[in-house]
């Protein structure tokens, strides 16, 4: 008799566990990409600490809200955002008056419906010619 009771209890526990797993899968499917909502509006990726690294992006569609993991590269340019991808030309010649080089970038891809400029211009300081350093390295190897 005890054997039958133990077997019945085990069968009920297994049935309850299977039912709970099925309900959990249904909940995941309802909020995921297969939901009725087609036009998600995604916000920017907000890093969890400092200004780069792993973080979260919030999306809304009607009354639904979702948070997904994302990553902001640590070498991103804050002026035009991490979700705007550009194809850049080569650096231009050094402008002696300002001491900077300029290049232009054309928008290649806007991720997560980001508002991006079609073209951007970026500058960087000109690097001084380093011929003296190159000669010094050659001389060090010879004894």
Curated annotation (Swiss-Prot):
Q: Where is this site: Required for high affinity binding to PTRZ1 by interacting with the chondroitin sulfate chains of PTRZ1?
A: 103
Give the signal peptide as a residue range, or say none if absent. 1-20
Q: Which domain of life is it from?
A: Eukaryota
Alphabetically ordered keywords of this record = Developmental protein, Differentiation, Disulfide bond, Growth factor, Heparin-binding, Mitogen, Secreted, Signal
The Gene Ontology CC terms held by the record are:
cell projection; extracellular region
TM helices/strands, residue ranges = none
| GO molecular function per UniProt | chondroitin sulfate binding; growth factor activity; heparan sulfate binding; heparin binding
* InterPro entries named in the record: Midkine_heparin-bd_GF (IPR000762), PTN/MK_C_dom (IPR020090), PTN/MK_C_dom_sf (IPR038130), PTN/MK_diS_sf (IPR020091), PTN/MK_N_dom (IPR020089), PTN/MK_N_dom_sf (IPR037122), PTN_MK_heparin-bd_GF_CS (IPR020092)
Q: Which GO terms describe its biological process?
A: adrenal gland development; behavioral fear response; cell differentiation; cerebellar granular layer development; cerebral cortex development; cytoskeleton organization; defecation; dentate gyrus development
Q: List the disulfide bonds.
A: 37-61, 45-70, 52-74, 84-116, 94-126
Its annotated compartments are: Secreted
Q: What induces it?
A: By heparin and retinoic acid.
Q: In what tissue types does this protein appear? A: Expressed in various tumor cell lines. In insulinoma tissue predominantly expressed in precancerous lesions.
Q: What does this protein do?
A: Secreted protein that functions as a cytokine and growth factor and mediates its signal through cell-surface proteoglycan and non-proteoglycan receptors. Binds cell-surface proteoglycan receptors via their chondroitin sulfate (CS) groups. Thereby regulates many processes like inflammatory response, cell proliferation, cell adhesion, cell growth, cell survival, tissue regeneration, cell differentiation and cell migration. Participates in inflammatory processes by exerting two different activities.
Q: What do we know about how this protein assembles, alone or with others?
A: Homodimer. Interacts with ALK. Interacts with LRP1; promotes neuronal survival. Interacts with LRP2. Interacts with NCAM1. Interacts (via C-terminal) with PTPRZ1 (via chondroitin sulfate chains); this interaction is inhibited by PTN; this interaction promotes neuronal migration. Interacts with NCL; this interaction promotes NCL clustering and lateral movements of this complex into lipid rafts leading to MDK internalization. Interacts with LRP6 and LRP8: this interaction is calcium dependent. Interacts with ITGA4. Interacts with ITGA6. Interacts with ITGB1.
By sequence similarity, the record places it as follows: Belongs to the pleiotrophin family.
- The entry's protein name is Midkine
The scientific name of the source species is Homo sapiens
Task: Quote the gene name from the UniProt entry.
Answer: MDK
């Amino acid at each position: 008799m005890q054997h039958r009771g133990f077997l019945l209890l085990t069968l009920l526990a297994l049935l309850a566990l299977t039912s709970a797993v099925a309900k959990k899968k249904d909940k995941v499917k309802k909020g995921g990409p297969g939901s009725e909502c087609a036009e998600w509006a995604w916000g920017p990726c907000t890093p969890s600490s400092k200004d780069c690294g792993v973080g979260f992006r919030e999306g809304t569609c009607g009354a639904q809200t979702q948070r997904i993991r994302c990553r902001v590269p640590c070498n991103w340019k804050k002026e035009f955002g991490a979700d705007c991808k550009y194809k850049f030309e080569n650096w231009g010649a050094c402008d002696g008056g300002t001491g900077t080089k300029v290049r232009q970038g054309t928008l290649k891809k806007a991720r997560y419906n980001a508002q991006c400029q079609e073209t951007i211009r970026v500058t960087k300081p000109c690097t001084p010619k380093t011929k003296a350093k190159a000669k010094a390295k050659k001389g060090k190897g010879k004894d």
